[in-house]
Amino acid sequence: MPKMKTHSGAKKRFRVTGSGKIMRQQANRRHYLEHKSSRLTRRLKGDQLVSKGSIKQIKRMLGI
């Protein structure tokens, strides 16, 4: 049986912490920022944990 390939899109979008949690970037911070408030863009800066419902699928794509 051949090895599973890592999903290229997933490896660019998600990172695994030392404790095994999966982090992701927040959406809506790429362009059209002039009409978004500073408060909103500041809040979107940080990474966030992946929701519990998506963890199993993302781990499979990353080959974890």
From Swiss-Prot:
Spell out the protein name for this chain: Large ribosomal subunit protein bL35
Cite a GO CC annotation: cytosolic large ribosomal subunit
- Which of UniProt's keywords are assigned here? Ribonucleoprotein, Ribosomal protein
What superkingdom does the record give?
Bacteria
- What's a single GO MF annotation on this record? structural constituent of ribosome
Q: Which PANTHER family match?
A: 54S RIBOSOMAL PROTEIN BL35M, LARGE RIBOSOMAL SUBUNIT PROTEIN BL35M
Say which family it is in.
Belongs to the bacterial ribosomal protein bL35 family.
Q: What is the lineage of its organism?
A: Bacteria, Bacillati, Actinomycetota, Actinomycetes, Micrococcales
SUPFAM superfamilies noted in UniProt: L35p-like (SSF143034)
Q: In the UniProt record, does the keyword Ribosomal protein occur?
A: yes
Which gene does this sequence derive from?
rpmI
User: GO biological process: any one?
Assistant: translation
